[in-house]
């Protein structure tokens, strides 16, 4: 039977929620990943060092006994952010600030209204070596939802990189050929995370044969040509600029199967297996370890994990749902097969 042993991966873009939801989902990530970059879009958002440290303590309390998993904490960038906050964050071990354009995604109401007013804050991030994580979509109602990432590149990303050229930027959960091209052409201070859904699915998987609410995420799934461009990027000559970030974003089944359903796909329970499928289909299994376990650590300036995990070429059936607080949670590929299984 085919096996693949790799350095334990890291999830460089993860939503763990809070309270009972946190307790339900944290063990799935802790089982596979050594570390994860934790998104700060709680209600209310994680905007201060005190918020982040308190949230980290709640995450640690939700982990299985004996877990070595390490959450890497971030702050939610707001219009009120200051260079002093950046210095405080650095001193406290916060790894990054996250940009949510106001209204772009779940719990983004506190997001930034004009990033260019925060240039002194971004300059301090560059000085302190704190990363800038970007949800790269414009929220202008005149821009079609399928075009919001591409529009963001010209309107925001390129001008910001020109004004703060040494800022370390992660273009999060990229979904388009345009975003991949920007990262490929930019300096080594610009990288990107890519989700399993944007490597495996296209917008037909959302809309053909009925609306599939469990395939609804933001940024929304794009055309097949964009999916192919992402696969080419993560397996190509400059693959070191791309790394694993699931954007696993749990919502209760009742909130997804809804007249106004929430955006987000829960992939944490089988994340590395789904990525293995992508790389296997692309004939690039030898590049999975760098994507999952090396590139992100290098970009964040942290050592690779010291231990390994082993994947077996053995099919598994994903549960139709798992418990989630008072309700249930539908994972990515629910009820379906994945051709790889982690040996636990």
UniProtKB/Swiss-Prot annotation:
Enzyme Commission identifier(s): 3.5.2.3
Pathway assigned to this chain's UniProt record: Pyrimidine metabolism; UMP biosynthesis via de novo pathway; (S)-dihydroorotate from bicarbonate: step 3/3
Single GO MF annotation: dihydroorotase activity
Modified residues (N6-carboxylysine): 98
Chain residues that bind substrate: 15-17, 41, 135, 218, 251, 263
Residues holding Zn(2+) 2: 98, 135, 173
Amino-acid positions noted as binding Zn(2+) 1 in the UniProt annotation, renumbered to this chain: 13, 15, 98, 247
Catalytic residues as annotated in Swiss-Prot or TrEMBL: 247
UniProt key word Hydrolase: yes
Quaternary structure (record): Homodimer.
Biological role: Catalyzes the reversible cyclization of carbamoyl aspartate to dihydroorotate.
Protein name: Dihydroorotase
Gene: pyrC
């Amino acid at each position: 039977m085919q096996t693949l042993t790799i350095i334990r991966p890291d999830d460089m873009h993860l939503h763990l929620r809070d309270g009972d939801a946190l307790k339900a989902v944290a063990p799935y990530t802790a089982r596979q990943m050594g570390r994860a970059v934790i998104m700060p879009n709680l209600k209310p958002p994680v905007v201060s060092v005190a918020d982040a440290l308190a949230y980290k303590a709640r995450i640690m309390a939700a982990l299985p006994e004996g877990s070595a998993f390490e959450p890497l904490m971030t702050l939610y960038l707001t219009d009120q952010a200051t260079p002093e906050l950046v210095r405080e964050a650095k001193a406290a071990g916060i790894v990054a600030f996250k940009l949510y354009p106001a209204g772009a995604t779940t719990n983004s109401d506190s997001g930034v209204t004009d990033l260019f007013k925060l240039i002194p804050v971004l300059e301090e991030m560059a000085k302190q070596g704190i990363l800038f994580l970007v949800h790269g979509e414009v929220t202008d109602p005149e821009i079609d939802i399928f075009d919001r990432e591409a529009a963001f590149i010209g309107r925001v990303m390129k001008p910001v990189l020109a004004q703060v050229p040494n800022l370390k930027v992660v273009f999060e959960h990229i979904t388009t050929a345009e975003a991949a091209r920007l990262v490929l052409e930019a300096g080594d201070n610009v990288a990107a995370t890519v989700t399993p859904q944007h490597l495996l699915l296209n917008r037909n998987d959302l809309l053909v044969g009925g609306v599939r609410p469990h395939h609804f995420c933001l940024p929304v799934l794009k055309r097949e040509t964009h999916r192919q461009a992402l696969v080419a990027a993560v397996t190509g000559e400059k693959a070191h600029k791309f790394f694993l970030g699931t954007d696993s974003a749990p919502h209760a089944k009742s909130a997804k199967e809804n007249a106004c359903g929430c955006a987000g796909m829960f992939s944490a329970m089988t994340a590395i297996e789904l990525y293995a499928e992508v790389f296997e289909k692309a004939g690039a299994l030898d590049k999975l370890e760098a994507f999952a376990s090396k590139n992100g650590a290098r970009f964040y300036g942290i050592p690779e994990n010291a231990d390994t995990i082993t994947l077996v070429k053995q099919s598994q059936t994903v549960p139709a749902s798992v418990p989630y607080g008072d309700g249930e949670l539908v994972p990515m590929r629910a009820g379906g097969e994945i051709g790889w299984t982690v040996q636990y």
